[in-house]
Amino acid sequence: MGSLKLSTFAIVVCLSILLISPIEVNGWGKCDLRKGLCRLADTISTCDVPCRAVDSKYHGGECLNVGGGQGICWCCRDYDAAKSGAEKESM
């Protein structure tokens, strides 16, 4: 029975990863990079350090719920940095 729950959880996580598109989190700006799984029970965001290590444009991360006490780390950058980067790319 335990393996059935684990299999169901794995399927939910995989589908969530495939279906979730870049998001905007209130107060965080544009969150457009997934950086692995996180635990929702942690009081300190475990997403901040790995997200900052990816690139200096990311100021931290947010753990968003996918069920079963687990979440997906989304790395976030502020709106101004995202906007100025898009303007530079379009030139």
UniProtKB/Swiss-Prot annotation:
GO terms for biological process: defense response to fungus; killing of cells of another organism. The keyword Amino-acid biosynthesis does not apply. This is Defensin-like protein 95. Coiled coil: none annotated. Belongs to the DEFL family. The keyword Ribonucleoprotein does not apply. Disulfide bonds join 31-76, 38-63, 47-73, 51-75. It is found in: Secreted. Keywords: Antimicrobial, Disulfide bond, Fungicide, Plant defense, Secreted, Signal. Residues 1-27 form the signal peptide. GO terms for cellular component: extracellular region.
